Amino acid sequence: MSDEKNKFTDASFENCDLKNPVDRDTLKKATDEFLKTHEAEIHSEVKEENNEVSDPLAALQDENKELKDQLLRLVADMENLRRRTARDVADAKAYSIANFARDMLSVSDNLNRALEAIPEGAKENDAGLKTLAEGVEMTERAMIAALERHGVQKIYPEGQKFDPHFHQAMFEIPNCDVPDNTVQQVVQAGYIIGERVLRPAIVGVAKGGTKGVPVESGSA
């Protein structure tokens, strides 16, 4: 377009007399013709100049969007980490004594076996033996109470529907008066801590009754 500009300003117009109507009209026509001929090119140059001005703004907007996306992802990751950490801490707190509690249950079992080994009527005939038995009973109850304060719960599911997640069936008891798989006898109580089974309840279940009567398993 620079060559055309030179043509427009060449010597043929340098001697124009603007006071002369003919020259003035000639110059006006030449100017209009020039603008009409090069209007598209002029608009293109203006558009390019505008684009050059707006490009940095668009780049900044794109960069801002990318940084915002990165920030949102970082916030989401931090929130997930916070929740996972809180869950891990809660689990560690709830289950930290699980192994210790399981060992204490064995002690409780031994205390109960000791009590069961005392012959019927022996305590009534021996004051010392009676006092000893009462002391053992108190010790066993205190131990279980201490475990319960730390989240350990006893399972004694007699009369409930057998649940393989919490119960272990050792034998069947023929009984047509109750639904199949109803716990008829508890040989050994079970224990849970939180949602984990420390020890399943050892049970005997009914066999021969009607089916399909749901009885939820729970702890006593």
Curated annotation (Swiss-Prot):
The family this protein is said to belong to: Belongs to the GrpE family.
CDD domains, alphabetized: GrpE
Top-level taxon of the source organism: Bacteria
Compartments reported by the entry: Cytoplasm
UniProt keyword annotations, A-Z: Chaperone, Cytoplasm, Stress response
Protein source organism: Bartonella quintana (strain Toulouse) (Rochalimaea quintana)
GO cellular component: cytoplasm
Self-association and partners: Homodimer.
UniProt-listed Gene3D superfamilies: 3.90.20.20, Head domain of nucleotide exchange factor GrpE (2.30.22.10)
Keyword Nuclease: no
BP GO annotations: protein folding
UniProt cross-references to InterPro entries, sorted A to Z: GrpE, GrpE_coiled_coil, GrpE_head
Principal cellular location given in the protein's record: cytoplasm
GO molecular function: adenyl-nucleotide exchange factor activity; protein homodimerization activity; protein-folding chaperone binding; unfolded protein binding
Role summary: Participates actively in the response to hyperosmotic and heat shock by preventing the aggregation of stress-denatured proteins, in association with DnaK and GrpE. It is the nucleotide exchange factor for DnaK and may function as a thermosensor. Unfolded proteins bind initially to DnaJ; upon interaction with the DnaJ-bound protein, DnaK hydrolyzes its bound ATP, resulting in the formation of a stable complex. GrpE releases ADP from DnaK; ATP binding to DnaK triggers the release of the substrate protein, thus completing the reaction cycle.
Protein name: Protein GrpE
